[in-house]
């Protein structure tokens, strides 16, 4: 880069930054290697999560008069992703569970209240990064004093119980809130995790200072990614690749899509079965 030239912004998503934090080697395989190593089989819990997200997004696109619990269940059935399950019978059991989840969840929503966005892409820029990402749902609400406020809603279908700390510490949710506030010129500090299996909502109200800290954290992570990307693109010997993109072996390696291409990950944890991430799994 020539002296005096503006620094190129690093384009990223919260998912990309999180991938770097989790494991630099997996980050390289996901975003830089071309072609990437072959992935393992699809995960049933990801199929279930995508099916639920798609059904809820479709529900909001229905005419208001048709936004009912059974309609959400029908959308779930129509868009069911039957991948990663041990058998058709197991898939059917979880499809029925998922149908009940979306019917129960949508029964508690006001169909007349239009979200500001559904599966909405938001983005923002700083002096260092150009960040973008997609929000499950962006609500427009009124505070007690009548002030217009926005809230970021993220659907969760995993078996792990959640707390407000999960909402508080989530870097993606904080970045989505900051980006949405800037895009819509409104206050957006509230982030919510809607855990459909338990029917619970776990929320956090950020301060401006808290959002600024999360943005600074994202910029620092992005700087590490950008430096590693440049070194990779310039060409690295095999030893250099591992030095810049080291593995982080641990129990999570059993869930990694690239476990078969990673000796350290393969040694760190046994491969999980594609349906092991489902609640109460038994084929």
Label each residue range with its predicted role:
Residues 120-220:
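Mg2+/Mn2+-dependent nuclease catalytic core
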Residues 54-119, 125:
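A non-catalytic, helix-rich entry segment at domain boundaries
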Residues 13, 114-120, 131-136, 249:
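Short beta-strand or tight-loop elements
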Residues 11, 179-283:
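Metal-dependent nuclease catalytic regions and adjoining charged, substrate-binding loops involved
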Residues 17-37, 41-62, 95, 99, ...:
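Nuclease catalytic cores
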Residues 44, 48, 94, 169-172, ...:
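Hydrophobic (often cysteine-bearing) scaffold residues that line and stabilize catalytic clefts
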Residues 24-32, 147-154, 226-227:
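Active-site-adjacent bridging/hinge elements
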């Amino acid at each position: 880069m020539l002296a005096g030239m503006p620094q190129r912004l690093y384009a990223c998503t919260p998912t990309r930054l999180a991938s770097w934090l989790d494991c630099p080697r997996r980050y390289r395989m996901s975003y830089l290697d071309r072609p990437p190593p072959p992935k393992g089989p699809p995960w049933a819990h990801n199929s279930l999560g995508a099916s639920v997200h798609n059904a809820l997004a479709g529900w909001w696109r229905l005419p208001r008069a048709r936004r009912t619990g059974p309609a959400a269940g029908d959308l779930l059935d129509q868009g069911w992703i039957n991948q990663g399950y041990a058998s058709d019978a197991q898939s059917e059991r979880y499809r029925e569970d998922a149908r009940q989840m979306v019917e129960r969840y949508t029964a508690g929503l006001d169909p007349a209240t239009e979200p500001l966005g559904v599966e909405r892409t938001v983005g923002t820029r700083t002096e260092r990064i150009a960040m973008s990402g997609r929000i499950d749902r962006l609500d427009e609400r009124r505070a007690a004093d009548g002030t217009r406020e926005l809230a970021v809603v993220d659907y969760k279908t995993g078996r792990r119980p959640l707390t407000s700390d999960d909402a508080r510490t989530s870097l993606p949710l904080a970045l989505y809130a900051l980006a949405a506030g800037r895009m819509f010129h409104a206050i957006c500090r509230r982030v919510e995790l809607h855990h459909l299996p338990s029917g619970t909502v776990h929320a956090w109200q950020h301060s401006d200072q808290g959002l600024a800290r999360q943005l600074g954290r994202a910029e620092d992570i992005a700087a590490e990614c950008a430096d590693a990307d440049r070194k990779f693109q310039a060409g690295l010997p095999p030893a250099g690749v591992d030095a810049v993109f080291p593995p982080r072996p641990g129990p999570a390696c059993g869930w990694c899509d690239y476990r078969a291409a990673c000796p350290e990950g393969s040694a760190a944890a046994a491969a999980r079965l594609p349906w092991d991430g489902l609640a109460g799994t038994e084929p």
